[in-house]
Amino acid sequence: MPLARIDLVQGKSPEYRRMIGDVVYEAVVSELKAPEGDRFQVITEHPAGDLIADPRYLGINRTADVVFIQVMMNVGRTLEQKKAFYKKIADGLHERLELRREDVLINLVEVGKENWSFGNGIAQYA
């Protein structure tokens, strides 16, 4: 059910990109309680300068290595689940890839269940 869009500066290895996807998927399952195998991700690299994130917004010091993670999902997660999700991703990317926690920007987009079709032109959750 969640669809993750991950945007980062180009030049990272396929293994690096895959690891970002793995960390996001694991957090989706463990913190948002999505079922195993519910992995839908689009990972896109951009030329330097095409990802713009204020380097000091909200007092967080970001670098040009910022990663944007946007997850579209069904409505219904608690604030506690969302906070745990953010932390799990930031910590996981830092531990596995040495990506600075400050460079991980996450956005959740909640939609109604009727807004999904996983194939065959059918709204499977409606």
PLM regions and their residue ranges:
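Interaction-mediating elements
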Residues: 1-126
